[in-house]
Amino acid sequence: ITDNNQIQLGIRDKNIEYAVSETGDVIAFVQQGELWCFDRVNNKIVQVFSFLGAEGINARDNWDQHDIKIARVDEAGSIDFVVYGYMNRGDHEGEVGTAVYHYDGLVHTIEEEIFIPSDVSYEILKAQMGQLMYVNEKGTFYLIMDQKLYSIDTDKRTPEVLVKDLKESCYKVSESNQYFAWVDSDKEYKSDVIHLMNLKNASVYDIKAKKGAYILPLGFIDEDFIYGAAKKDKVMVAAAGNTVFPMKNLTIMDTSENSHSILKTYEPSRGSIGFISVEDYTITVSYTHLTLPTIR
């Protein structure tokens, strides 16, 4: 419902899946398993995708084991989005998987670009979805599903697995989803190379550790990449089975325009860094038993 150029969604949780065009004139949002597009300039709202029939009372239609993630919306109201989980109807009715769609806002048509079946439940897909989803200007669609990074050529409608066996501790994604940093899963906590991919142009830059050190991706501040280094002889498996990775320093790298210049290096005067947390533009660096001053 639109009222005074606003959308009233009624009583629902605060976590709304939505995306806004560059100028802010077009808003795509998900409401009760349906995708909608709102044109603020013309005060018009369009239903883009729904499994519901005209009556909306069919048990098959109302089976809510699916969800929608929006990748991109433009000024014409065209939307790239993903439907994942149990497919209530259509060509893949009864299957579980991920479908990539493109909605053309000018002619109001929707086209399935690819469907990737999955043997995991909707709940597992939901936990994985949203870790990375990006569409570049060439129309290449990237997403993480089933512990794999997929590259999907939407013209050829073919998926390619770029990285497999992903572990959450082995990769990080920038806020815009444009940059993806990872170490090979078989070298978790013992890698001397971090791969940094710019999904805008599919270029990969390898960050190499100094002699005698392992490196690990830690996160991003906007598009600036943060990674830590630990001495090889200090990395060990504790009695509880967890790996101790005591970092001797942190590095913040500029990724803009593929410059890869070092913006800042932080090395504590004593001891080692146990872990970090990133919030807004602040990195909180912590020892195992002692919190250090924040880096801004």
Please state what every model-predicted region is:
Residues 30, 91-96, 143-144, 187-191, ...:
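Short, solvent-exposed loop/turn segments at conserved positions within beta-propeller repeat blades
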Residues 1, 84-95, 231-245:
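Short, conserved, GDST-rich strand-edge loop motifs in beta-rich repeat architectures
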Residues 2-8, 49-62, 112-124, 266-272:
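Surface-exposed loop and turn segments in beta-propeller and other repeat-based domains
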